[in-house]
């Protein structure tokens, strides 16, 4: 037990501190903005009732999004039956990964569920959500089309997010993103916080998850492949152009160079263009590549071996 605890401390130490700093900044700006708005309305006697409403709305929306929605989500997943849960019988590899990975990372083992989107069978989400104990929802498309090591890699990233305390904020961003516009207005204080997190914190949090997942997997090509396939599976324009997982593998093997085949060239061009346009994701890949080629990465592997 002592050895595991010491290893966890060393493991988390390789996360860049900028993510924590930016997360605190987003929280501070959100609290300051809400208190300032409440105080401004309370300053004027005619608006004091509005100030009370704003403050109550802030508390209610926070409780609703951070507590009620996650609890309802867990109940819905549990209600689907044991055939949708990740267990030793139906998904033994993934279940073993969650058990051993949780111990290695130093978090409580999350509940695991297979998620089938009613409107789209090709659901490739691999995400962690909820309040402790967390749960991991894996799309049926991910279990079907991703290579098992790639699915393992994405699941380990979820455990890393849990280790770094990212789950509540990631869940918040995802829930607000999926809400209709009218619902976002109803929880506008939380929508403001989600916007601040997305602008200031999200990219750094994802980059840290990439770094620490790589320390667990110890295979840069596998991590890159998993990240790129996750990117393609959630990029509507690439899917519409027929860019698939085979094109990701071709892209990695060719080092980003265009192939001679017309169909391959078109797919590679579309993928390369999408990567250039998504500055945040491209920066994550570049940062990961830089770190892999650095002495710090080699030293980290030796320390955690």
Where are these regions (language model features)?
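Hydrophobic or amphipathic, alpha-helical segments that drive membrane association/targeting
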Residues: 1-122, 298, 302-305
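Active-site metal-coordination segments of metallo-dependent hydrolases
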Residues: 80-95, 194-215, 275-276
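Catalytic Zn2+-binding segment of zinc metalloproteases
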Residues: 158-178, 220
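Active-site-proximal gating segments in proteases and membrane effectors
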Residues: 109-133, 184-186, 192-194, 216-305
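Short, charged cytosolic
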Residues: 1-7, 131-144
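Short pre-active-site segment immediately N-terminal to the catalytic Zn-binding motif
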Residues: 138-153, 200
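An active-site-proximal "capping" alpha-helix that borders the catalytic cofactor pocket
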Residues: 98-102, 152, 158, 202-223
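A hydrophobic membrane-anchoring feature enriched in long, contiguous, low-charge segments
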Residues: 39-43, 172-196
